[in-house]
């Protein structure tokens, strides 16, 4: 029997990936994605890799601005560039070039000459959260990335740990921190808050925190007693999800965030959730709550600031209180691309970092917390 050509062998393997991929769980999908990215690095040159990534984000941002993805999603039939140009008041030739690039990245599908339709991912790109995410990546993170090489060369011996004098300040020519800058730019602030809706919902903290077991001995007979405090909780997505799953557990649920964020939250919040302006640098005003929760917040603080913030939480905790930190742990070896990219986003925009297990352990020891449970989810 003749040996198959290498390309045919690869085609057979890829066919299996396409068939089996939809049945994988979250953990297995992450492993396969990493393997596929690794395989791709063996069949393209570094320059091809750079070209593949360089233009897509700008095109996604433009497509979101003019309603391109919404138009494709809302249509039952493929649309020509001429039709899209008239509908969106855009140049048909430019649209064709943009759509070809997006199709090459599998973000839309080309069905014929200058004719395109929506892919599955196009549905996501048409959503407000993803549109805001594109703006956040392009308008803030892409700009800080451009300043990153020069900043690092100019500060070779220094760590990036000052949110008032870092890469963001060089990129935006400002003395303000990223958070302070956003306060003066409500449109960008809105993009950031909307993009938080993209947070993962499959296999998350609610699936691993034994909430019902933890509250068996906790009494909430006092109507003012607080069950759950979400510190830095944005628009309240996690509070809402908590109350949606545990609607009958007594106790108040309180969302805390910066005043400008709290002002944007529609009132009243569902399930009786309370919104409270709060800054991590201040003493924690809610005393003796059962759960103090923080999700993807400490990565935005320097080591010294995060230690100070955790001390403020510790000072408010009672004997039955628990601190729940929901954040990424960078593995010691073999970190995935997404985790490393997030680490660079934190460094470039807010002088923050995604931390390793040892770095998290140092935070715990410094604040004299006892680790009751360490749960991993994807």
UniProtKB/Swiss-Prot annotation:
Catalytic EC class: transferase
**At which positions is S-adenosyl-L-methionine bound?**
232-233, 257, 279-280, 295
Q: Which UniProt keywords apply?
A: Methyltransferase, S-adenosyl-L-methionine, Transferase
Give the practical application: Diterpenoid pyrones display various biological activities and FDDP E shows anti-HIV activity. FDDP D and FDDP E show also inhibitory activity of 42-mer-amyloid beta aggregation that is involved in the pathogenesis of Alzheimer's disease.
Pathway given for this chain reads:
Secondary metabolite biosynthesis; terpenoid biosynthesis
- Bilayer-crossing residues are none
- A Pfam match: Methyltransf_2
Active site, renumbered: 299 (proton acceptor)
- InterPro entries xref list: COMT-like (IPR016461), O_MeTrfase_dom (IPR001077), Plant_O-MeTrfase_dimerisation (IPR012967), SAM-dependent_MTases_sf (IPR029063), WH-like_DNA-bd_sf (IPR036388), WH_DNA-bd_sf (IPR036390)
Q: At the top level of its lineage, which domain of life is listed? A: Eukaryota
Which GO biological process entries does UniProt record here? methylation; secondary metabolite biosynthetic process; terpenoid biosynthetic process
Spell out the molecular function terms from Gene Ontology: O-methyltransferase activity; protein dimerization activity
Q: Name the family.
A: Belongs to the class I-like SAM-binding methyltransferase superfamily. Cation-independent O-methyltransferase family.
Q: Which PANTHER family match?
A: O-METHYLTRANSFERASE DOMAIN-CONTAINING PROTEIN, PUTATIVE (AFU_ORTHOLOGUE AFUA_4G14580)-RELATED
According to its UniProt entry, what is the function of this protein? O-methyltransferase; part of the gene cluster that mediates the biosynthesis of diterpenoid pyrones. The first step of the pathway is the synthesis of the alpha-pyrone moiety by the polyketide synthase dpfgA via condensation of one acetyl-CoA starter unit with 3 malonyl-CoA units and 2 methylations. The alpha-pyrone is then combined with geranylgeranyl pyrophosphate (GGPP) formed by the GGPP synthase dpfgD through the action of the prenyltransferase dpfgC to yield a linear alpha-pyrone diterpenoid.
What is the name listed in the Swiss-Prot or TrEMBL entry for this protein? Answer: O-methyltransferase dpfgI
Taxonomic lineage is:
Eukaryota, Fungi, Dikarya, Ascomycota, Pezizomycotina
Gene behind the chain = dpfgI
